Amino acid sequence: MSVEPSLNRAPIMERFGDTIEDLGTAHGIDVFAVPPERIVEFCRFLKEHPAMQFNFLSDICGVDHYPETPRFEAVYHLYSLPNRWRVRIKCRLGDPPEVPSVTGVWRTANWHEREAWDMYGIRFAGHPDLRRIYMWEGFEGFPQRKDFPLRGYKDKLNPFGAEGPPPTQPDLATRDIPQGRPSTPES
């Protein structure tokens, strides 16, 4: 069994310094925390730098950390085929969650970002076609958010869904999650 080579962090830390956070290694994957305003620059650097060559975007997923603040996170998984390195980038987002699109770095980000939008409501600024990918266009809310009712909402396609008044903001002190429909960002 061969040992995978270690990621050379020097070029990354030299370029980004204190603007990112090196979170170490988890399960053999190097992890960095990057603020949303630096995500495109950081991803482009990892892809284009000759010593890095992260040419494969494995996925982008959303995370809802309710009741923590900031509540949302976009997580990017990258792979360098020539170096056999894996990197996870964590990007914490406010509410409503928004981060610049990386479709200009990897075209495959298109579908990953649409999935995170559809399930969590994470808006990817500059995305060429940000619309639902799993749920139908008239669907209300984002089903992977922790404040989404387990039975969904009552409508003509789901007569057994939850009913109730429009939601209020969650009360973080009591961890009370409203039972109504979550507000959705304007298109």
Curated annotation (Swiss-Prot):
Record membrane topology: Peripheral membrane protein
Superkingdom of the source species: Bacteria
Pfam families hit by this protein: Complex1_30kDa (PF00329)
GO molecular function: NADH dehydrogenase (ubiquinone) activity; NADH:ubiquinone reductase (non-electrogenic) activity; quinone binding
Statement: the UniProt record of this protein carries the keyword DNA-binding: no
One GO cellular component term noted in the UniProt record for this chain: plasma membrane
Subcellular localization: Cell inner membrane
UniProt keyword annotations, A-Z: Cell inner membrane, Cell membrane, Membrane, NAD, Quinone, Translocase, Transport, Ubiquinone
EC number(s) given by UniProt: 7.1.1.-
Assembly and binders: NDH-1 is composed of 14 different subunits. Subunits NuoB, C, D, E, F, and G constitute the peripheral sector of the complex.
PANTHER family noted in UniProt: NADH DEHYDROGENASE [UBIQUINONE] IRON-SULFUR PROTEIN 3, MITOCHONDRIAL (PTHR10884:SF14), NADH DEHYDROGENASE UBIQUINONE IRON-SULFUR PROTEIN 3 (PTHR10884)
NCBIfam families: NuoC_fam
General function of this protein: NDH-1 shuttles electrons from NADH, via FMN and iron-sulfur (Fe-S) centers, to quinones in the respiratory chain. The immediate electron acceptor for the enzyme in this species is believed to be ubiquinone. Couples the redox reaction to proton translocation (for every two electrons transferred, four hydrogen ions are translocated across the cytoplasmic membrane), and thus conserves the redox energy in a proton gradient.
Name the record gives this protein: NADH-quinone oxidoreductase subunit C 2
